[in-house]
């Protein structure tokens, strides 16, 4: 069943608000219309393109500063950070991240994105991974965008430990999940 333009545009606004990193191609598939129709709808609704939306989210939310490592040491691009709370990063899977014979992302890149996000979310000068329990749930291919979301689930400053849960998504599908037991200094 086709939706009316007004209904589609209302759903488009809601979808982009809840999932700001969704591409025009993904939106076109979701709504069963052409990419051009999505672009025209966005233009009519004054919704910026994906790159601009990512930049806007980053500017609005990155007022906290990563303490435990420098931003160039983070794998992926951090777009949201609340120290000792939660964080989000994006990794565009490119040719250098995949096996040449099948264009599937090497697992260590997905782990590195999640692990560096788990380190970055810690509100401490020193944060190291003590242990990790991880699971890869599906292959990630070249050209896909991996959005990693980290959430601090337990902080025991007197023991110098923090637990961070990280789930990585392509679209709405979980492709990686991990629980990271992080060591932090006891002085913070």
UniProtKB/Swiss-Prot annotation:
GO process terms (BP): fatty acid biosynthetic process; negative regulation of DNA-templated transcription; negative regulation of fatty acid biosynthetic process
Database matches in SUPFAM superfamilies: Thioesterase/thiol ester dehydrase-isomerase
GO MF term list: DNA binding; DNA-binding transcription factor activity
Gene3D superfamilies in UniProt: Hotdog Thioesterase, Winged helix-like DNA-binding domain superfamily/Winged helix DNA-binding domain
Pfam name, any one: 4HBT
Keywords, in A-Z order: DNA-binding, Fatty acid biosynthesis, Fatty acid metabolism, Lipid biosynthesis, Lipid metabolism, Repressor, Transcription, Transcription regulation
Reported function: Transcriptional factor involved in regulation of membrane lipid biosynthesis by repressing genes involved in fatty acid and phospholipid metabolism.
Similarity remark: Belongs to the FapR family.
Record NCBIfam families: PRK04424.1
Descriptive protein name: Transcription factor FapR
Organism: Bacillus velezensis (strain DSM 23117 / BGSC 10A6 / LMG 26770 / FZB42)
């Amino acid at each position: 069943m086709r939706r009316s333009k007004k209904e589609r545009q209302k759903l488009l606004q809601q979808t982009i608000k809840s999932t700001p990193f969704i591409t025009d191609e993904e939106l076109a598939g979701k709504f069963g219309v052409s990419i051009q129709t999505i672009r025209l709808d966005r233009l009519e609704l004054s919704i910026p393109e994906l790159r601009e939306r990512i930049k806007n989210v980053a500017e609005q939310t990155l007022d906290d500063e990563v303490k435990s490592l420098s931003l160039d040491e983070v794998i992926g691009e951090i777009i949201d950070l609340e120290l000792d709370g939660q964080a989000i990063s994006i990794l565009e899977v490119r040719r250098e991240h995949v096996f040449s014979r099948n264009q599937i992302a090497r697992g260590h890149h997905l782990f590195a994105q999640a692990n560096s996000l788990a380190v970055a979310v810690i509100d401490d000068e020193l944060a190291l991974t003590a242990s990790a329990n991880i699971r890869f749930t599906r292959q990630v291919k070249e050209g896909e965008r991996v959005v990693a979301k980290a959430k601090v689930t337990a902080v025991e400053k007197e023991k110098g430990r923090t637990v961070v849960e990280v789930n990585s998504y392509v679209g709405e599908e979980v492709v990686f999940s991990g629980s990271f037991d992080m060591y932090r200094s006891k002085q913070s």
